[in-house]
């Protein structure tokens, strides 16, 4: 059964690779680890943290520490028309996409693809092909979320904070079948209440974080993008970082690296995938409505 599950996932990955190459001209290896973040572009959903991981991996590859297999970081998102920082995050991701594709030392191992005009048609290809489901919002900010459920149902393994429906997924699949990181909701709320979070302290105290954030305004990036947009995002992260990207960044990198290592045990990864599919039944509309009726509506069958 696990071999059949692997084969189905591989077919879906090949179909997505074909779609991306036809529509965007970017070649993706179907044997890659498909790391996917698809959702509304918002600071609290922290696509910017995923982008900072990409910068970290970029430096790793340049230093000769190559991944076991290629890693395409796939994004699908749209921002509200007047949401300036969200558009700056998209701009950063697109600059990194171009940078990686242009560097022959990097592109065989690491790519970013932000699909154009993300919509339901793209979701129908992305969700079944996903290996790593990025659900990395700041704890306490996600009301629930349903994208994580769709990806879970299609055999993706979640990388996430203990936020929103990730908490329920964690309880359903067990710790060995989900990868969690980051501060808890209680810790985050305490930092807000005390007004004690200072991203500049993390930036100044951690050379790795400083290097990654500084790269946003590196001359390589400025050559590809708009210095105003990149500079604005840089200042936002160092000076404010309201959604605490820098706070969780190092643990996020470590957890994702553990996932990539665990992916190499293909049978065990397929088992994790199968557990996620099986446990996704909890989120069915039938069970939900039955629960509402039992606890709220109290209607009787005729």
Locate each region found by the language model.
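Catalytic binding pocket for nucleotide-activated donors in carbohydrate/polymer assembly enzymes
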Residues: 128-129, 136-273, 277-287, 291-302
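Conserved aromatic-histidine-acidic binding/catalytic patches
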Residues: 4, 8, 29, 39-42, ...
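Contiguous, well-ordered alpha-helical segments that form the cores/surfaces of helical PPI scaffolds
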Residues: 39, 121-131, 149-150
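Long, K/E/R/D-enriched contiguous segments that form extended
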Residues: 13-123, 138, 298
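Active-site-proximal structural scaffolding
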Residues: 9, 13, 34, 44-50, ...
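Short coil/turn segments at secondary-structure boundaries
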Residues: 3-8, 18-36, 69-72, 109-110, ...
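C-terminal, helix-dominated tail/subdomain
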Residues: 74-77, 131, 185-186
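N-terminal leader/propeptide and maturation segments of large enzyme subunits in energy/redox metabolism
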Residues: 1-21, 201-208
């Amino acid at each position: 059964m696990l071999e059949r599950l692997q084969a189905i996932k591989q077919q879906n990955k090949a179909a997505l690779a074909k779609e991306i190459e036809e529509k965007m001209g970017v070649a993706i290896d179907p044997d890659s680890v498909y790391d996917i973040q698809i959702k509304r572009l918002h600071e609290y959903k922290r696509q910017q943290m995923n982008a900072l991981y990409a910068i970290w991996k970029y430096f790793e590859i340049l230093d000769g520490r190559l991944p076991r297999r290629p890693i395409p970081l796939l994004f699908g998102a749209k921002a509200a028309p007047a949401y300036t920082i969200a558009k700056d995050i998209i701009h950063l991701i697109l600059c990194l996409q171009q940078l990686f594709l242009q560097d022959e030392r990097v592109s065989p191992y690491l790519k970013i693809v932000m699909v154009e005009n993300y919509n339901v048609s793209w979701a129908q290809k992305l969700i079944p092909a996903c290996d790593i489901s990025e659900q990395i919002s700041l704890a306490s900010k996600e009301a629930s979320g349903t994208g994580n459920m769709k990806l879970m149902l299609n055999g993706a393994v979640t990388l996430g904070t203990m936020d929103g429906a990730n908490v329920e997924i964690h309880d359903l699949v067990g710790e060995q079948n989900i990868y969690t990181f980051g501060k808890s909701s209680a810790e985050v709320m305490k930092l807000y209440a005390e007004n004690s979070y200072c991203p500049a302290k993390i930036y100044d105290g951690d050379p790795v974080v400083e290097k990654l954030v500084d790269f946003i305004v590196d001359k390589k990036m400025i050559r590809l993008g708009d210095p105003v947009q990149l500079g604005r995002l840089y200042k936002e992260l160092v000076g404010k970082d309201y959604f605490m990207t820098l706070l969780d960044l190092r643990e996020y990198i470590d957890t994702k690296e553990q996932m990539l290592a665990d992916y190499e045990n293909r049978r065990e990864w397929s088992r994790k995938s199968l557990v996620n599919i099986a446990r996704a039944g909890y989120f069915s509309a039938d069970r939900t409505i039955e629960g509402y009726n039992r606890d709220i509506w109290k209607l009787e069958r005729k």
